[in-house]
Amino acid sequence: MADAAQNQMVEIDPDFEPLSRPRSCTWPLPRPEFPNPAAADSNTSSPAPSVKQEPSSTADFINNLSLLEENEDYPDQKPLMLCSEFQCQENCIHQQQIPSQQQQVPVLSSPVAAAAAAAAAAQRKSSSSRRNAWGNMSYADLITKAIESSPEKRLTLSQIYDWMVKSVPYFKDKGDSNSSAGWKNSIRHNLSLHSRFIRVQNEGTGKSSWWMLNPEGGKSGKSPRRRAASMDNNSKFAKSRGRAAKKKLALQGGPEGGADSPGSQYGKWPGSPNSHSNDDFEAWTAFRPRTSSNASTLSGRLSPFIDDELGDSDVHMVYPGPGSGTKMTSTLPSLSEMAGSLGHSGSENVMENLLDNLNLLSPKNPSTGGPGSGSNQSSPSSLMQASPGYSPYSSPGLSAVSQQTQQDFRKCLYGQAGMGSMSPMPMQPLPESKPSFGPGGGTMGQFNCTAGLLKELLTSDGEPGDLMPSVDTVVSQSAGGSGCMLPPYSSGRNELMGGGPTHSHTLSHPHNMHGQAPPTSVALNGRSLHPLTAIGHSSVGGRLGSGKSPMQMQYGGSGHLGGGLPPYCSMSSNGYGRGPGMMAHQQLQHLEKLPSDLDGMPIERFECDVESILHDTLMDGESLDFNFDPMNSQQGFVPHSVKTTTHSWVSG
């Protein structure tokens, strides 16, 4: 019978050409069309089958596939638990097909015969087909029968193997180690996969466990696949996702009215904040400060908001000077604290200035962040001057100090304080060639601003004619372990550009540190902060000779005052830098001693080496009456006194 099938295949397709079956593998099969039996008879002898021979060739093709599968599945062996139904079907099919080739009986020309042949083949495939090579039983069925055949209703793994080889004809010649690896692995897999089998510990030592049938029945089929906990099937995540879905539905069904509301439209985007629950949203928003922190980008704060909740990942490691290895974690005072210290009449202008400054924070000149040393570096202030958006610290409403009141300065101060943490100017490390005065651990120490200092400064020395003591919140709020004073800028920029005398409204507050490091007066340019930490770059560097040269210290922001007199906090002033007597010639007296550095450095958190700054900056100030013993600095010595005109410094 197999030989006849092979001969038929050779007759039908000698050159292995594809059979002409326009609708193969479809149901119902196309109806055969034979106009006359003579034409069909003549076409059978042709080597290439025609379309009119289609039903016969289709049935033969199905029949040949059946024979080939049976030849592969060991046709000499009989199935284990099958009746002779398959052989009967096979014989019936060939009894129908062989006469059709020899005699061309008109039965095949009728659609009923072709449909019967196809139905018989389909029945063989569906109901009686063997799922495995040994028959219709699965591995689990064979294992179940093996365990049930044992007298104790339990078998070890090796006994199950032996039963397979003895009882199943397919495994008789597959008992050796080479050919049994595959099916034995399947046996072990099914034993552990199905819940119908249970493992019982063997009493004897060194013996394998017993495998028994589950007395509770168990599942006859496959149990669900066990998966590791992931984002998809984790119960905690599923609960949070369910809560998020409920909240999103509640938001969509809110007063704005279903899907027509903007919140519902944007909430359908899976990456939007509306599609996350509150638990996930905190982690979702925490990526910004970590990936865009100043410590990693060196481009200043990028987000136009004051983030009071940044963790240690945003702490700025500023200057690798001796002894400066700690992180500063104190933050800016909140908006409510600063607003409380301002005059009510100036609060509206303050908010307008803040809104204007928020649009100017993205650094237009990435080249300003490059490291540099010495006083010859081109000042980023000129780049800031060239870019139209770089005046975040010059309030638009401030024109001249002589026409401004104390509230105007407070507006400047608040704009400075609010934007100080978002300074667009990057930080720059001190040059390594700087003479480090305290090598190793011999530092003057980090001067700490106490927690109660803010409230104390808000209420101390608050004379009406003075600049507000709450400015100390701007100065003393800089990093909690640092004594670096960051005086706010002066609002008298325009008059100083003209060279005329004016009041210097910048602060030097000698009283606010209470015996700690004196807040060095820094030349302030009306644009940005000049932190004390950077004075040690080139204290004796540029002079006022060329107008820009005194301001070209690393980040000299006053370089735009070509030939002008940049305002600054003078140490010889009365501590607040106030009074009409503070004229331009007094400012010239100390301008060359106090270079302007790092004008855009954020004052929120940073480190500074107070010892190096005091040594490099204040020791060479000729007009400063400053008493400092360099021999004791190795032991963390604080300077005994720094004399100004009205205040004296006493070490704490």
UniProtKB/Swiss-Prot annotation:
Which InterPro entries does the annotation name? FH_FOXO1, Fork_head_dom, FOXO-TAD, FOXO_KIX-bd, TF_fork_head_CS_2, WH-like_DNA-bd_sf, WH_DNA-bd_sf
Cite the record's Low complexity compositional bias ranges.
Answer: 362-397
Which intervals carry biased composition (Basic residues)? 238-249
Entries under SMART domains matching the protein = FH
* One GO-annotated biological process of the protein: lymph vessel development
Which residue intervals make up region (Disordered)?
1-57, 208-277, 359-406
* Keyword Transferase belongs to the record: no
* One term under GO cellular component: nucleus
Annotated DNA-binding residue span(s): 134-228
Print the keywords alphabetically. Cytoplasm, DNA-binding, Nucleus, Transcription, Transcription regulation
**What is any Pfam family matched here?**
FOXO_KIX_bdg
Where it sits in the cell: the answer is: Cytoplasm; Nucleus
Function, as annotated, reads:
Transcription factor that regulates metabolic homeostasis in response to oxidative stress. Binds to the consensus sequence 5'-TT[G/A]TTTTG-3' and the related Daf-16 family binding element (DBE) with consensus sequence 5'-TT[G/A]TTTAC-3'. Main regulator of redox balance and osteoblast numbers and controls bone mass. Orchestrates the endocrine function of the skeleton in regulating glucose metabolism. May be involved in regulating cellular homeostasis in the eye.
This chain's protein is named Forkhead box protein O1-A
Species lineage, top-down?
A: Eukaryota, Metazoa, Chordata, Craniata, Vertebrata
- Coding gene? foxo1a
